Amino acid sequence: MYLALVALTLLAACVIVQSAGILLLIHWLPRVREVLESPHVYRRVGLLLRVFVWIVLLHLIQVVLWAFVFFRAGELPNLETAVYFSLVTYTTIGFGDVVLGPGWRVLAGIEGLTGIVLIGWSTAFVFAIVNRMYEHWRQVHDPA
């Protein structure tokens, strides 16, 4: 029961981080119109680069949340190992060279599921931005 509560708390924290980060990006995105209307391609590339960096930072924050819990619970020997384990688990790479103890293994699976869903959310968000750029380009270059 305790581990289920830990998992639920971490999942909720990750959703809060992801939501807050995406909402901040959405708040910032009205400036996209001026980027889209700019004749300079480098501004569009710069916009995408900023979005990608921001999204990677959001996911790294989530990875560190999981890692901190694993480290504080004494499941992993140091924070560096915990971050490494959490990163390969969250991204579902799962090398298997670092593992949790029997009681905590299920949390690794939940972290992986959380990562899949939230990375998917980020992918959908980036797709929406790129689609918006494409639609704008199409209207300008192929108005028919």
Would you name each region that the model predicts?
Residues 57-85:
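Outer-pore turret/helix-boundary of cation channels
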Residues 27, 31, 71-72, 128:
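Transmembrane helix-loop junction
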Residues 30-42, 139:
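Membrane interface segments of multi-pass transport proteins and intramembrane proteases
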